[in-house]
Amino acid sequence: MGRTLESKQQIVEELKQLLGEAEMALVLDYQGLSIKEMSDLRTRLQAANGVCKVTKNTLMRRAIDGDSAWSNLDSLLTGTNAFVLVKGDVGGAVKAVQAFQKDTKKSETKGGLFEGKLLSQDEIKAIGDLPSKEALMAQIAGAINAVATKVAVGINEVPSGLARALKQHAESGEG
């Protein structure tokens, strides 16, 4: 038995809400994945504030209709699709999907959309290779700390150098 019009409208509204909060969308071919494997993917995505929705392409098409931010997603809506919608750690979600695909060897990323731009598989892989937000913040903090240390050493070196020069001059004057 098919879905009623009301349930389809409810699904479209839920998709619109998820898309409104999402920063990135990935489109995966889920053909051949078991329910257990899909549950595993959903669990992996939770840590990165990602959700995986399996829905008909026509319902997703209705959800993105008239939304310029997501309209480019239309070109990926063919075949059996699962949609990964990410509203937080984009890199973490891509890494979770890549780890899942490596473990199962069944799913394939068709493409994605980030900030209105269609992403190829290579661009998605590049996002997954980026360090996490926390790692980047640690690198920046380390760089700032190194600069502050060098400035402090430089400021401290001026009077020390002057003192050494005066001492050397005084010693050479005695001889």
UniProtKB/Swiss-Prot annotation:
Keywords: Ribonucleoprotein, Ribosomal protein, RNA-binding, rRNA-binding
Presence of keyword Manganese: no
Presence of keyword Ribosomal protein: yes
Gene Ontology terms, MF aspect: large ribosomal subunit rRNA binding
One Pfam family cited in the UniProt record for this chain: Ribosomal_L10
GO cellular component: ribonucleoprotein complex; ribosome
Biological processes per GO annotation: translation
Record text on subunit structure and interactions: Part of the ribosomal stalk of the 50S ribosomal subunit. The N-terminus interacts with L11 and the large rRNA to form the base of the stalk. The C-terminus forms an elongated spine to which L12 dimers bind in a sequential fashion forming a multimeric L10(L12)X complex.
Function: Forms part of the ribosomal stalk, playing a central role in the interaction of the ribosome with GTP-bound translation factors.
Family indicated by similarity: Belongs to the universal ribosomal protein uL10 family.
Protein name: Large ribosomal subunit protein uL10
UniProt source species: Synechococcus sp. (strain WH7803)
Source species taxonomy: Bacteria, Bacillati, Cyanobacteriota, Cyanophyceae, Synechococcales
